[in-house]
């Protein structure tokens, strides 16, 4: 028999290991709605309200808080408790003045890193690809599923793996951070997840093999990671606070 649409359920034991939730306390978990991030690199908004921040004891209480519009993601009110909040997203609570950025820690778990109100208006976006669209415009497609249009004359300022510092929620480009030697990067996946440092070398391989970058951390230690795991967050120093 053919499938009747996407899966709607998720057992806790099968939930991504990046989530900080109790796996044996209950049978079912909240399955994030299809959206800006994939399931492995995001977490449902309900868990942020209840399990991460402790503003609710039950899912019902968490949904009530969200329905009152008390939580913002990237400067916009989000009421959907299944909304996927992923890497580099900013979670804000205007009533308490709290602001957090979603980042992975050294064991690959998604955490809420406290940030200032000023930094909450800045979101780094990694360019996945770009393409031409109607009206002689170039569409930049970012890691969080969003996109942005730029004039054709500016196409040579933006390339794959570059990072755009976007002002949210206005969606205004503040700065472009190139992926090059000397750039400051944060590793988002792999065995070196959450490590940070400056790019020393970019190794390119033929025949479809993924590119590798060599990074020097703050202690002077060198390590390698895949290019797609390295997220540029600054030129000679990070433009955002990191854990």
Curated annotation (Swiss-Prot):
The keyword Cell membrane does not apply. Keywords: Ribonucleoprotein, Ribosomal protein, RNA-binding, rRNA-binding. Residues 43-105 form the S4 RNA-binding domain. It holds the Pfam family Ribosomal_S4e. One of its GO terms (molecular function) is structural constituent of ribosome. Belongs to the eukaryotic ribosomal protein eS4 family. HAMAP family: Ribosomal_eS4. This is Small ribosomal subunit protein eS4. It comes from Pyrococcus abyssi (strain GE5 / Orsay).
């Amino acid at each position: 028999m053919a499938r009747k649409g996407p899966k709607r359920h998720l057992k806790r034991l099968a939930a991504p290991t990046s989530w900080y939730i109790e796996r044996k306390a209950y049978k079912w978990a909240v399955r994030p709605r299809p959206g800006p991030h994939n399931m492995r690199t995001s977490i449902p908004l309900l868990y942020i309200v209840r399990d991460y921040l402790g503003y609710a004891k039950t899912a019902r209480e968490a949904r009530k808080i969200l329905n009152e519009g008390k939580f913002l993601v990237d400067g916009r009110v989000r009421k959907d408790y299944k909304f996927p909040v992923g890497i580099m997203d900013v979670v804000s609570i205007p009533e308490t003045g709290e602001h957090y950025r979603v980042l992975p820690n050294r064991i690959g778990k998604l955490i809420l890193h406290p940030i200032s109100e000023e930094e909450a208006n800045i979101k780094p976006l990694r360019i996945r690809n770009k393409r031409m669209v109607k009206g002689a415009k170039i569409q930049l497609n970012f890691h969080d599923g969003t996109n942005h249009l730029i004039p054709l004359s500016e196409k040579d300022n933006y390339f794959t793996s570059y990072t755009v510092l976007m002002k949210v929620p206005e969606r205004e480009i503040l700065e472009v951070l190139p992926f090059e030697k000397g750039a400051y990067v944060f590793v988002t996946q792999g065995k070196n997840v959450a490590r940070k440092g400056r790019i020393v070398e970019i190794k390119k391989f033929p025949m479809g093999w993924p590119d590798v970058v060599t990074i020097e951390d703050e202690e002077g230690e060198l390590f390698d990671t895949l290019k797609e795991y390295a997220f540029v967050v600054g030129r000679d120093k990070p433009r955002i606070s990191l854990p």
